Amino acid sequence: MLRANAAMRSLLGSAAFAVDQPTVPEMEQTTLDAGWTVEPSGALLLVRHRPKCMHDIPAEALGGGEYEINDVYVSLDDLGRESVDFLPRAASRGLYFARRMLASARGLPGSETLLAAVAIHVDVDDEDFALQGATIRFFSRRGSYPDWFDELETFTLEAIAVLDMSDVRT
């Protein structure tokens, strides 16, 4: 079930959130098209993000290892940062990408515990704001895994949403 902090809830409630059908830039589309691989250890990794030389992630560290590798930057450059609807559209794109990747993992061993954390930088006064994209990280709740998403309101400079398989439309 989707959980979101106040900043993300604000973006989701905006009329601009549903302005258009979300799109995915070409580079991220290749990540969607390539899909997932299941490592011998059971780790769920994005094919395009899997290191060429990689040691197995131990069972006791599966979620944390997945989190480090399944780190996707989704460009927002084409959305027009000066536009009033930029942030809601950025959230829409990030959530759309996360749902598509979760859907493509459905049925893989361990996917029932797979989560997607979507982050959109909302501090418009930050000098690096124009460089920010959407960050989506995928990890399972197996072994040690990031627990800092348990309390989303601690994130004040980012709109954060955490999705699981129940958020994927069939």
Predicted regions and their residues:
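N-terminal leader/targeting segments
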Residues: 1-68, 72-73
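Generic hydrophobic secondary-structure signal
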Residues: 44, 69, 74, 97, ...
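Generic alpha-helix signal with a bias toward terminal, lower-confidence helices
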Residues: 20-24, 48, 79-86, 126, ...
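Acidic, proline/glycine-rich low-complexity IDRs
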Residues: 92, 99-170
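Short glycine-rich, basic-tinged beta-strand/loop micro-motifs
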Residues: 61-91
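A short linear-motif detector with a strong N-terminal bias
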Residues: 23-25, 52-53, 94-96, 115-117
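Pocket-edge structural micro-motifs
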Residues: 48, 76, 140
